[in-house]
């Protein structure tokens, strides 16, 4: 069993028993393919006696392998082991290897089952395995190549294929510059083409070929999957076309985008620095002449300037000796203002000085009778004649025609 074995060790296989599932230990040997043998995984039963109706050795052909994936935490395994899946066309095997060796077993099986392709381990069971994808080196370049091959394919339903209304069987052709899809109700009709420089990734497995189109394709971006037994041939044809296109492409330098400085330079401004740090004016720089100012209006002159001009005028008239005026900014700091008169109701009753209404008198009527008594001084009475002449009471001329007339004042 040791001749030509790529890897050997112990693996556990989960088997269905009468009363449930049970793990059994096997000696495992992994063999690569040759001209006289197929790549395979052999599980040899241990020294314990095999059960009846069970073969002592199990052989798993790696050419029938569809996927190899690590099992998640939902799959229980023996102590100090980790489980992984090995799916073939006939059945699904659940194997377990020592935790430190599971990665080596999975990688070795993948290299023999899918030669020449980089493997991407899928997630836990229940997630659909995706074909391993390879980056396209000509994505977004602009060169054409010349392979021309045709392959019969069947479209698998995906989001991109449903958007393009692609269903059924078609012919996939590797053209000179693009991957072309031919078919439809009329023969010889090209439905879509995907330029090689716009294909992001492409991959294949035993029964599937798929690629991811860029957004600049006519179909739009998305994944397209095809069922075909010629997946490896399509992959090699595409790889050959892209390699030839890459070798024929001239090495043109990519234009570098203009770099934007982190901080833009700012022109020097005299207001951005202190007054003491301003540089002296250059002798070669002409000094701009001051602009002539128009006649200022009356309200444009500050009040202190108006006060100074009025003070000069009044000084000449009143002959008052001139007084030094303080700076208008500080002229009211220490100025002594006269005290404001107190309000009449601010003083307590009986303390304030007597005013006009502090000595009321009782009104008396018939002022004409009281003021015309004989004890009054007749020298204070005056009469105004129509001619505008004034005479005192003692100088009246007796026996005149109008000595009886009394002038009365009308109401105001």
From Swiss-Prot:
GO cellular component, one term: plasma membrane
Bias kind Pro residues: ranges: 277-291
Annotated stretches, region: Disordered: 246-296, 359-412
Regions of compositional bias (Basic and acidic residues) in chain numbering: 361-378
Gene Ontology terms: biological process: cell surface receptor protein tyrosine kinase signaling pathway; cell surface receptor signaling pathway; Ras protein signal transduction; signal transduction
Molecular function terms, GO-annotated: transmembrane receptor protein tyrosine kinase adaptor activity
Top-rank taxon, per record: Eukaryota
Annotated PH domain residues: 4-114
Post-translational modification: On immunoreceptor stimulation, phosphorylated on C-terminal tyrosine residues. Phosphorylation on Tyr-345 is required for binding to the SH2 domain of NCK. Phosphorylation on both Tyr-271 and Tyr-299 is required for interaction with RASGAP. Phosphorylated on tyrosine residues by TEK/TIE2.
Cross-referenced Gene3D superfamilies: Pleckstrin-homology domain (PH domain)/Phosphotyrosine-binding domain (PTB)
Keyword Phosphoprotein among record annotations: yes
Tissue: Highly expressed in peripheral blood leukocytes, lymph nodes and spleen. Lower expression in thymus, bone marrow and fetal liver.
Domain IRS-type PTB: 147-252
Phosphotyrosine modifications at: 271, 299, 345
Keyword field: Host-virus interaction, Phosphoprotein
Domain statement: PTB domain mediates receptor interaction.
Physiological role: DOK proteins are enzymatically inert adaptor or scaffolding proteins. They provide a docking platform for the assembly of multimolecular signaling complexes. DOK2 may modulate the cellular proliferation induced by IL-4, as well as IL-2 and IL-3. May be involved in modulating Bcr-Abl signaling. Attenuates EGF-stimulated MAP kinase activation.
Family: Belongs to the DOK family. Type A subfamily.
Self-association and partners: Interacts with phosphorylated RASGAP and EGFR. Interacts with RET and NCK. Interacts (via PH domain) with TEK/TIE2 (tyrosine phosphorylated). (Microbial infection) Interacts with Herpes simplex virus 1 (HHV-1) protein UL46; this interaction induces DOK2 phosphorylation and subsequent degradation.
Protein name: Docking protein 2
Organism: Homo sapiens (Human)
Gene: DOK2
């Amino acid at each position: 069993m040791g001749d030509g074995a790529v890897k050997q060790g112990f693996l556990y296989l989960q088997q269905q028993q009468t009363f449930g599932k049970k793990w059994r230990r096997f000696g495992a040997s992994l063999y690569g393919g040759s001209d006289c043998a197929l790549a395979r995984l052999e599980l040899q039963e241990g020294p314990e006696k095999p059960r009846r109706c069970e073969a002592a050795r199990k052989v798993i052909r790696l050419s029938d392998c569809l996927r190899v994936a690590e099992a998640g935490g939902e799959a229980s395994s023996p102590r100090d082991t980790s489980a992984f899946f090995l799916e073939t066309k006939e059945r699904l095997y659940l194997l377990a290897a020592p935790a430190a060796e599971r990665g080596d077993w999975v990688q070795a099986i993948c290299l023999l089952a899918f030669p020449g392709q980089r493997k991407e381990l899928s997630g836990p069971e229940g997630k659909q395995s995706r074909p391993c994808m390879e980056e396209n080196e000509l994505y977004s370049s602009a060169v054409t190549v010349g392979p021309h091959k045709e392959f019969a394919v069947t479209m698998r339903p995906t989001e991109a294929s449903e958007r393009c209304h692609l269903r059924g069987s078609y012919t996939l052709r590797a053209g000179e510059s693009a991957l072309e899809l031919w078919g439809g109700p009329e023969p010889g009709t090209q439905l879509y083409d995907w330029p090689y420089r716009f294909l992001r990734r492409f991959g294949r497995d035993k029964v599937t070929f798929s690629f991811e189109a860029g957004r600049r394709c006519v179909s739009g971006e998305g994944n397209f999957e095809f069922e075909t037994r010629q997946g490896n041939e399509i992959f090699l044809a595409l790889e050959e076309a892209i390699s030839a296109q890459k070798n024929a492409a001239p090495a043109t330098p990519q234009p570098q985008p203009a770099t934007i400085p982190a901080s833009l330079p700012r022109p020097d401004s005299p207001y951005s620095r202190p007054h003491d740090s301003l540089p002296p004016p250059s002798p070669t720089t002409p000094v701009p002449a001051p602009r002539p100012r128009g006649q200022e209006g009356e309200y444009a002159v500050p009040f202190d300037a108006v006060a100074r001009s009025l003070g000069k005028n009044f000084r000449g008239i009143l002959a008052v000796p001139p007084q030094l005026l303080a700076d208008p900014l500080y002229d009211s700091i220490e100025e002594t203002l006269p005290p404001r008169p107190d309000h009449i109701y601010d003083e307590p009753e009986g303390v304030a000085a007597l005013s006009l209404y502090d000595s009321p008198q009782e009104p008396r009527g018939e002022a004409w009778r009281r003021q015309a008594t004989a004890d009054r001084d007749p020298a204070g009475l005056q009469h105004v004649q129509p001619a505008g002449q004034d005479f005192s009471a003692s100088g009246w001329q007796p026996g005149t025609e109008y000595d009886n007339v009394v002038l009365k004042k009308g109401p105001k």
